[in-house]
A protein has these predicted regions:
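Catalytic-pocket segment enriched in acidic/His residues
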Residues: 15, 52-55, 69, 75, ...
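N-terminal non-catalytic cap/leader segment that marks the start of a structured domain
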Residues: 1-108, 276
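Non-heme Fe(II) oxygenase catalytic core, chiefly the N-lobe of the double-stranded beta-helix
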Residues: 120-156, 161, 166-170
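A generic local secondary-structure boundary/capping motif
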Residues: 5, 76-78, 98-101, 125-134, ...
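Short catalytic-site patches enriched in acidic/histidine residues
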Residues: 109-128, 148-149, 189-198, 256-260
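Short loop segments at secondary-structure junctions
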Residues: 10, 24-25, 145-149, 169-170, ...
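Structural signature of FAD isoalloxazine-binding scaffolds in flavoprotein oxidoreductases
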Residues: 103-121, 136, 270-281
Length: 298
């Protein structure tokens, strides 16, 4: 099984490189076609035939090429560090809507995050001094593979490149200050994602996956994606009815029940806490919470 990843060997490098990982081995895509594919987005924008050729080349490299790296020697970043859009669903599991004491929405409820929120699967999450009510939300993320607009639900999965894992970290006090949730969602480092993109060909049905979230080793969320109110296909059909989806766009499909704000007593995140989100057949992200450094005062 291949995973598309963004990585860097040097933590001081200004940008992420694109690679294909298999088990613990990694092939840098810059070695193919004179460096044409230096980003995951450029791979996703390639034609299906070209993608097949790239993956065939990757297989040959893994079988004895000179460009094999070890995943243990690199830092993984967000799989798509430069998406055009990050669309996030809210209230997409019935038990989560119930714990939030909200009605099931008639159409998908969504909001946006931005690139500043993206970090890798093991990067620290910075807890802002402006909030004391930080929460976790484990989610399945859909990565769009082909431009689409006005897509029928029965055809929607054909436009998916693959799937990855996200923690939609949320500052509940900032989120609920207004009817728009952006202030509590689009915070720096609040979308750790990874470890890579598992291709859609390896996950023909995204509605049969088990999602598990752990805080300091304790399971706090466990649910099947079969329980989504709006399936991946239905969500793509809805969004594409009024916006063009592009290769590399990310759709976070909502979190199940078990969020910290609705536990008794509430369980918010603190510096030192470690949150793991794992989805079967895709992988796990593991991020430590770190307090924001306060600015120096004169």
């Amino acid at each position: 099984m291949f995973r598309l990843v963004s990585y860097r060997s040097d933590r001081t490098a200004p940008s992420w490189r694109a690679g294909v990982a298999s088990h613990h081995a990694l092939i840098d895509l810059a070695g193919y076609a004179d460096g044409t594919y230096r980003s995951v987005r450029s791979f996703l924008a390639a034609s299906p035939d070209e993608q097949e050729q790239i993956l065939a080349w990757t297989t040959r490299q893994l079988d004895g090429g000179e460009q094999v790296l070890s995943l243990d020697e690199v830092e993984l970043g967000p799989p798509v560090p430069d998406p055009e859009k990050i669309v996030c669903l809210g209230l997409n599991y019935p038990e989560h809507a119930a714990e939030a004491e909200l009605d099931i929405p008639p159409v998908p409820t969504f909001f946006a995050k931005f690139r500043n929120s993206l970090v890798g699967p093991t990067s620290p999450v910075i807890l802002p001094a402006a909030s004391h009510f930080i929460d976790y939300e484990g989610e399945l993320v859909v990565v769009i593979g082909k431009r689409c607009k006005h897509v029928a639900e029965q055809e929607a999965l054909a436009y998916v490149a693959g799937y990855t894992v996200c923690n939609d970290v949320s500052a509940r006090d900032l989120q609920m200050q207004t009817s728009q949730w952006t202030a509590g969602k689009a915070i720096d480092t609040f979308a750790p994602m990874g470890p890579g993109i598992v291709l859609a060909s390896d996950i023909p049905d995204p509605q049969v996956l088990t999602l598990t979230t752990r805080v300091n080793g304790e399971v706090v969320q466990r649910e099947s994606t079969s329980q989504m109110i709006f399936s991946v296909a239905a969500t793509i059909a809805f969004l594409s009815s009024f916006m063009t989806l592009e290769p590399g766009d990310l759709i976070a499909t909502g979190t199940p029940s078990g969020i910290g704000a609705r536990r008794q007593p509430p369980q918010f995140l603190h510096p030192g806490d470690i949150v793991e989100v794992e989805i079967e057949r895709i992988g796990m992200i593991r991020n430590q919470m770190v307090a924001e450094a306060r600015p120096q005062t004169r």
